[in-house]
Each structure stands twice: as structure tokens, then as C-alpha cells.
Swiss-Prot record:
Protein family membership: Belongs to the WhiA family.
Name of the protein in question: Probable cell division protein WhiA
Source organism per UniProt: Thermobifida fusca (strain YX)
InterPro entries, A to Z: Homing_endonucl, Sporu_reg_WhiA_N_dom, Sporulation_regulator_WhiA, Sporulation_regulator_WhiA_C, WhiA_LAGLIDADG_dom
Protein origin, superkingdom: Bacteria
Keyword set, alphabetical order: Cell cycle, Cell division, DNA-binding
DNA-binding feature ranges: 275-308
Gene: whiA
Transmembrane segments: none
Amino acid sequence: MAMTGVVKDELSRLTVLKPCCRKAEVSTILRFTGGLHLVGGRIVIESELDTGVAARRLRKDIAEVFGHESEVLVLSPSGLRKGNRYVVRVIKEGESLARQTGLIDSNGRPVRGLPRHVVAGGVCDAESAWRGAFIAHGSLTEPGRSMSLEVTCPGPEAALALVGAARRLKVHAKAREVRGVDRVVVRDGDSISAMLTRLGAHQSVLAWEERRMRREVRATANRLANFDDANLRRSARAAVAAGARVQRALEILADDAPPHLVAAGKLRLKHKQASLEELGQLADPPLTKDAIAGRIRRLLAMADKRAADLGIPNTEASLTPDMLVP
């Protein structure tokens, strides 16, 4: 299954208990996939989704959080549409649901951005809004030069609101228009991982990061094949291995590592091909080669000790056979 499908499936099965979060997720899904129709003078709400599990989740939340019944229609593949599509439709009391979810304002006019209770809500509401937006119209590409997490939005106002929600989650996202379609894009690999973690797609993050690391190792191996100097090959391979160990060390220690050691480790992660001397120059304030090496060494030692105490894999467990070749 492609990464987009993996993430959507995991998010659609995620258990969310807080009513405000469920409300924010439903409101965003309806805003990004829904259509308001007047049928016989009454408002009917339709939301088209690409998986059955997402449709069942939406229908369940509409009933449990808002108290409205809905029906699910299955649209068979046709034209460019390869798979089934699932339409969740609310016919009875559609106007009431539209007001509850913020799709229309007090005067009955459609809301163009995200509903007020989502925009003005807490961090958990921002997370839920992004989760709903991704379930509705999100995509995740494979790790590589053009990797991205992207959401197609119903308009520029909704796109800007989603960028604002990402900012509250401390994730950098950009709104852009491509061929008349508004999109919000997260491109940086670390930002993509952070966003997926925020949304609750923990298994998907692990799978995506594994593919990302494999690609980096392969790319490094390809560069190494062109190196004439054996010392340069060993140094580059050691840098990649050190980066993998540092990543694992930061996961083990979480918030318990001293800030100056964390800073040294993050420098190594950000500049995996840099020499120790170059890393020292990038530090603030600049450090000597021995000083930066010592900090990284202490970070790894502290993490390995913590791993031994907890009985979990240490930093060397993150190394792959490609990294161990002399």
C-alpha cells in the first residue's frame, strides 16, 4: 500500500476520546470534503471520502458527537476514478449539523475558512483539524528529493487557516496555488515526521522514517562508490552511522538529555556529511573538533546506559549492515 493509504488507514482507526477533538475533526472533514445542497428547501450535507473505514468513522462521530443520523452511499469506479468512493449524507436536520460544525454562520451563510471553534481552539483542536484534513484530501509521497505531505484545500481561506494550525503545532507549512487548486504543503523531512506524529500516525511515521533512512544510506553508498580516497569513504560512512546512533539516542533520552549534548546531536543529524571540524564551526558558539566529538560521545554513552537500564535496544541497534561495512 502507498504511504498515503497507510497513513489514512491508521488515522481512520485512531481512537480519539475528547469531544472537542472529535468535533474539530468532523468539522474539518465536512469542510474539506463536504457539499451543502438545497433539496426541497432543506440543507443536505454530503461528504465524499476515498475509504470505507474513513466513512464509517465520520458517520459514527456525526451520530455520537452531534446526534444526527447519516447514510453511506458507495460510488463504483468510473472514468479516471479507480477505486470506490464513499459518500456520507445527512438529509434530516442537515441545517442543524451545518450550524453545529460551523459550516454556516448564524445568518446561514457558508463559512469560507475553518470554523471559529477550530481556529480559536487549543493545540489538540489544531491536531484534529489537520487529521481531518489529511483524511479528507491528504497525500504523502515517498522520501526523496521531492518528498512532501500535502493537503488539497477547498479555498485559500481554508488553506491559510490550515497553515495557521500547523504553526500552532510548531510545524512549517506553506500555502500555494497550483493550476487553480489551493494546497498546503509540508516539505522538510523532519517536519513531515513531526506532523505525522502530531496526527497520531505513529506506525506510519516509523515506516516512513525507515524508508527515508534506507534512501539516505543508498544515496550515501552511491556517493561513496565515486570516492577515490579510502579515508573519505570511511569518514562519510562513519558520519551516517553516527547520525543513526544520535537519532536513536535522542529517542531514548527524550527530554532528559542535557541541552548542550542535544544541540551537538542535532547538529550531527542536520549535517550528516560534515566533518567534526566543520560541525564545531557550525555550533553556536563555535567549538573545537574535540569538544563537539566529546559531546556527541557523551550523548551516545548516556543513551546506551539508559537503554541498558530499561532493557531496550541501544544506539547501535539503529545501525544497518550498510553502515558497518569497513
